[in-house]
């Protein structure tokens, strides 16, 4: 029993017309054009050498150590995400990766397309998803929530790249959610639709923040946002721009989303933050206070919430936005936001006197910082 020598390896490869150049890790191999389809990888060359020497001369021994196979963190997170979307009412769809050339003619063309309509690799999903929603609504399925995890193909810096993305569309309320709307299918507003997406993504426990959209022309500029993961732009969410739906009478309100899968899953698996953490259960109740303010529309809700958390760090446990009221009788630049503030002390039950001063100082800080006015 022995290992193959370098001379035996080079001799067999040269026998089939390969040209070899010695490098630091072994050889660089040039393959004849007529063998380029079957000799693409290192394992193909190994199989060819074994064939020429004779399979019967090799020792039939299984490599050690043998370890059971398992899913990678990326695969586990992807499956977890898929199940979460399905559990939250979304339907998974599958669309062609081949599409027709767009008006900008910046899609990657394939060399020998069967038909003109399938001559390029897709660079986005939203065109096909709009068609799916349109077909469902025309078929009587008024509430259509879909998602798809797949690859897009882009040309960046004169180099073709492949990126995995999470995409989807949300239109109207699902049938099982119509019990409180007298059986009528009504459109979701921006915040409700964004909440549905956030609920589906919460399984990975990754913080996703929004900033105003200034890039994606197929989205409504005032009802869309760029999604940030760990400070990096990683996708978008928003209502489709009316110009995209010109001539379409079946779709009223439609929200699209696209998220870079690598950025999302890397953020979740790097520290395994999607793995549940156990904490001590709070044995004392919290005190909740609802507070409403009139803000200028230029202020972003996330900035307001971050300011509240920054001002009070000791007793303030949670801040959530519970209501938005845009009264047409108010000034065009003003909007009412209502927040719910939860206070809790881990060691004792809070009394009204414990939080009254803190709560009042918080209100004054918000009014000063954002030039807002509390509504009572």
Task: State where each predicted segment sits.
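Extended, well-folded interaction surfaces typified by the phenylalanyl-tRNA synthetase beta subunit core
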Residues: 1-144, 342-345, 354-376
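Conserved alpha/beta core surface patches that mediate binding of polyanionic ligands
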Residues: 2-16, 44-47, 92-93, 123-171, ...
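A carboxyl-terminal module marker
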Residues: 6-9, 13-18, 22-24, 175, ...
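Internal insertion modules embedded within essential enzymes
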Residues: 30, 34-82, 100, 159, ...
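Short glycine/proline-enriched turns and hinge-like loops at secondary-structure junctions
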Residues: 40-41, 104, 121, 140-143, ...
């Amino acid at each position: 029993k022995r290992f193959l020598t370098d001379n035996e390896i080079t001799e067999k490869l040269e026998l089939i017309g390969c040209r070899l150049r010695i490098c630091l890790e072994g050889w660089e191999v040039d393959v004849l054009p007529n063998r380029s389809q079957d000799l693409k990888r290192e394992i193909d060359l190994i199989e060819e050498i074994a064939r020429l020497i004779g399979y019967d001369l090799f020792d039939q021994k299984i490599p050690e150590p043998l370890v059971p196979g398992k899913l990678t963190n990326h695969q586990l997170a992807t499956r977890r995400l898929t199940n979460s979307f399905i559990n939250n009412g979304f339907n998974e769809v599958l669309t062609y990766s081949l599409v027709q050339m767009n008006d900008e003619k910046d899609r990657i063309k394939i060399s020998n397309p069967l038909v003109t309509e399938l001559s390029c690799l897709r660079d986005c999903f939203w065109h096909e998803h709009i068609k799916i929603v349109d077909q469902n609504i025309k078929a009587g399925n008024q509430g259509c929530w879909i998602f798809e995890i797949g690859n897009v193909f882009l040309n960046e810096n004169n180099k073709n790249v492949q990126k995995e993305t999470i995409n989807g569309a949300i239109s109207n309320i699902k049938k099982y959610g119509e019990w409180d709307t007298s059986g009528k299918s009504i459109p979701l507003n921006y915040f409700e639709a964004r909440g549905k997406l956030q609920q589906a993504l919460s399984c990975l426990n990754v913080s996703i923040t929004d900033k105003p959209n200034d890039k994606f022309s197929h989205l409504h500029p005032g009802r869309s946002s760029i999604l940030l993961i760990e400070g990096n732009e990683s996708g978008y969410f928003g209502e489709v721009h009316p110009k995209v739906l010109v001539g379409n009478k079946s779709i009223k309100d439609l929200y699209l989303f696209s998220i870079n899968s690598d950025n999302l899953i890397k953020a979740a698996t790097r520290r395994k933050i999607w793995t549940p953490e156990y904490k001590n259960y709070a044995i004392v109740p919290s005190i909740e206070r609802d507070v409403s303010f009139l803000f200028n529309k230029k202020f972003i809700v996330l900035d307001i919430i971050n300011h509240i958390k920054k001002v009070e760090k000791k007793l303030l446990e949670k801040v959530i936005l519970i209501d938005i009221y845009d009264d047409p009788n108010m000034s065009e630049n003003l909007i009412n936001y209502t927040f719910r503030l939860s206070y809790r002390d881990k060691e004792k039950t809070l009394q009204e006197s414990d939080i009254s001063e803190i709560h009042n100082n918080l209100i004054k800080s918000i009014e000063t910082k954002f030039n807002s006015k509390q509504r009572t």
